[in-house]
């Protein structure tokens, strides 16, 4: 099933404009869709007690690029209580470029919003001052409208840049406006800047490539072991499917 034919492209799914922008822009860079095993590419299921069963839909979509992108994938979830867009670009390690990470989650009473160029090396070894200044300026503009959430723990913060957007919003009309306007604008600015940098980057030497491979593996292994979405996914799809999805699709190249 094509992602354009799913519920995730319809206006009633919370993150549809973000997903459309992702897919359209990656296609402009001649990215090729990657075949995802059918058990993960689209799934309809139910969750909850026998008396109050609820439907849930999951779609996993991905692309690659012959030189620049090892794997870029989106995981989309739609249900009465949860709506999720999780997106990650894993760049080719011949370029010294961070990950691009998005985690937009709608819970029963709150929105959790994360957007960042996530480092695979120490900040000073992967971001020049010009890039950091651009990111921090974009972040500060976004957070002039969206509240900044609490400080991340040291263990988690090492996988985020100084330009990370991190916010929590209550489920109310004002938040809908902020998501459709300020967050969407920031999302487009971040993705456009990221793809520009990725596709203009020069190849690095073998020693740095080895560091990048190790750095990417450290992040992916950490996420496989500590993915904060694991409890939610398990409640919606069961533990066995969740573990398989996390280990075989979400955090692998």
UniProtKB/Swiss-Prot annotation:
One GO molecular-function entry: phycoerythrobilin:ferredoxin oxidoreductase activity
Thylakoid keyword on record: no
Keywords: Oxidoreductase
Superkingdom of the source species: Bacteria
InterPro entries membership: Ferredoxin-dep_bilin_Rdtase (IPR009249), Phycoerythrobilin_Fdx_Rdtase (IPR022827)
Function: Catalyzes the two-electron reduction of the C2 and C3(1) diene system of 15,16-dihydrobiliverdin.
The protein, known as: Phycoerythrobilin:ferredoxin oxidoreductase
């Amino acid at each position: 099933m094509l992602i354009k034919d799913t519920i995730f492209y319809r206006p009633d799914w919370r993150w549809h404009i973000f997903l459309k922008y992702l897919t359209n822009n990656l296609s402009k860079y001649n990215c090729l869709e990657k075949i995802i095993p059918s058990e993960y590419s689209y799934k309809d299921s139910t969750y909850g007690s026998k008396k109050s069963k609820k439907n849930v839909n999951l779609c996993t979509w991905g692309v690659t690029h012959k030189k620049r992108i090892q794997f870029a994938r989106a995981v989309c979830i739609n249900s009465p209580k949860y709506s999720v867009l999780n997106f990650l670009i894993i760049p080719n390690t011949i370029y010294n470029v961070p990950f691009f990470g998005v985690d937009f989650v709608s819970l029963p009473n709150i929105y959790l919003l994360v957007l960042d160029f996530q480092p695979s090396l120490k900040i000073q070894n992967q971001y020049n001052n010009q890039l950091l200044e651009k990111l921090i300026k974009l972040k500060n503009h976004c957070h002039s409208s969206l509240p900044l959430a609490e400080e991340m723990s040291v263990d988690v913060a090492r996988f985020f840049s100084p330009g990370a957007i991190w916010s929590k919003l209550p489920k109310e009309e004002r938040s809908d406006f902020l998501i459709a306007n300020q967050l969407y604008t920031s999302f487009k600015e971040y993705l456009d800047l990221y793809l520009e940098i990725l596709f203009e980057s020069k190849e690095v030497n073998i020693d740095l490539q080895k560091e990048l491979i190790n750095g990417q593996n450290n992040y992916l292994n950490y996420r496989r072991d500590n993915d904060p979405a694991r409890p939610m996914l398990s409640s919606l799809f069961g533990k066995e499917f969740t573990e398989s999805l996390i280990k075989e699709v979400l955090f692998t190249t």
